[in-house]
């Protein structure tokens, strides 16, 4: 399984100033639970936001610049990251450029919808899910945080 996982504002924002512009601990717990024991693939800016490898995961960072960090593998392209990840479960965890390219490899897209409005020209956006390629599942309440909603999209096979 290869999937994309992210939280998004009503405006399609996933980041601002190198940070996630909201704090929802329940969604963080769910992210940890889902991604632990898997491979996570991220871009350099997403890695820089965390500042270190995510524990209990195999971390692959797509970057063209040198990066020397413990427990991190680096590759120059997303295609190389996917090849290096192999056959186990893989989550693409950001940022926007990774998400733009990752849809070509993703089987699922797991989206948390947050109510926080972000109206800032510096905000980083993710494009809407292409529903001609991904079948939307039901919009369901977030099991770990009231007030948030989730939807899982699955690649269409028709």
Each predicted region: which residue ranges?
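Enzymes that bind and transform nitrogen-containing heteroaromatic metabolites
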Residues: 1-158
């Amino acid at each position: 399984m290869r999937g994309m996982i992210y939280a998004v504002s009503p405006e399609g924002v996933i980041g601002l100033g190198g940070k996630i512009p909201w704090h929802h601990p329940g969604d963080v717990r769910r992210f940890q639970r889902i991604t632990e024991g898997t491979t996570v693939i991220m871009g350099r800016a997403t890695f820089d936001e965390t500042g270190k490898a995510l524990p209990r995961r195999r971390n692959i960072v797509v970057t063209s610049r040198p990066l020397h960090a413990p427990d991190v593998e680096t590759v120059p392209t997303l295609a190389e990251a996917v090849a290096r990840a192999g056959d186990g479960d893989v989550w693409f965890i950001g940022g926007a450029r990774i998400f733009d390219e990752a849809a070509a490899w993703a089987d699922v897209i797991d989206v948390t919808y947050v109510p926080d409005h972000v109206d800032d020209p510096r905000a980083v956006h993710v494009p809407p899910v292409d529903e001609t390629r991904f079948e939307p599942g039901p919009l369901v309440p977030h099991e770990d945080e009231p007030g948030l909603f989730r939807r899982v999209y699955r690649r269409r096979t028709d």
